[in-house]
Amino acid sequence: MDPAELLKKYQPQDFKVLTADPQVTAARFSPCGKVLVGGGYDARVRRWNFAIGDLPELPALEGHHGWVEGLAFRAEGELLFTADSWGQICCWSGYTGDQPTIKWKVDNAHDGWIRALSLSPDGKAIASCASDRFVRLWTTEDGVKQFEFPQTPQQNLSVLFAPDGTFFTGDDRGLVRHWNVNGTLIRQFDASSLYMLSRLQDVGGAFVLALDKSGTTLAVGGTKPQGGGTVTGVPSILLFDVATGAEKQKLELGTVNDCYVADIHFHDEGFLSVVTFGTPGAGQLLYIRPEDKTPFLTEKKMANCHSLAWHPDGKRLAIAATNGGSNGNGRPVDKDGKYVANHSPIHVFTLPS
């Protein structure tokens, strides 16, 4: 389908803005589409009811100790998996209900910030990666550790299961590894163009991973770094052939102030939807076909986007972003002298299709 036809079908239309205060790191739809879940900076797991037209908020889930960044669902048994910056993983049962319960938790699943979770295709295992440089597999039914992979030289930022049961990890130097669940390394993908050392600062890395529906093309998102400190860089995606490890395409998606690709989704119609974050106030929603050099949709009205989630019905889209005039350095205070915290507007769109 050509870009004009795709845009006609998938042009986002404003529906509602939900507010998460303080911010959420990401927001994801449950497989049934009844609930949108966000991982909070305040250690809460926020939920919104998408089975009701005005999208009311459901009671938050409490039990974490730090930022909740890892989110994954298993439809069977309505299990929600969450992970935080203190190294804890929780499994919640009944995520669409008013009071989900903790089925199990592992307080010290990792020694440090858990950056991502991914569910195996058969629903029996959950993979986690963290700042301690370990990747671990856990049994979804009881949280027992199935396997621990050898500690990698650098911390891993991303983890993603493939349809065939193998999985990928991406580290902060831009090296992506393809693993069997028995610990065998299948191959490596060189995404080091998404990394630079700026004095003592590591900038970039394999920030986000995505696969097309067939599992044959791997997208690695991050930035083409230009400088450290207040990071500048061009949001970039590298597309690799999974079978060979060869880089097929590089997509550069903005200016040096747009910085990072935050999230990627391969649509069944063959295009990628992407959100980015950059210098305070810079955020983009982009649609681009892998074979093209320029997006056929560029929307810049949202600031510093964190995540992008397509509803299972294909007719709605939710993007977690940052409030305008966000406080990035801690200086602004209110009339009482208190720190002004940021919040997350979650933009909900409907789609013509």
What are these regions (language model features)?
Residues 1-353:
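WD40-repeat beta-propeller superdomains and closely related acidic/aromatic-rich repeat-like regions
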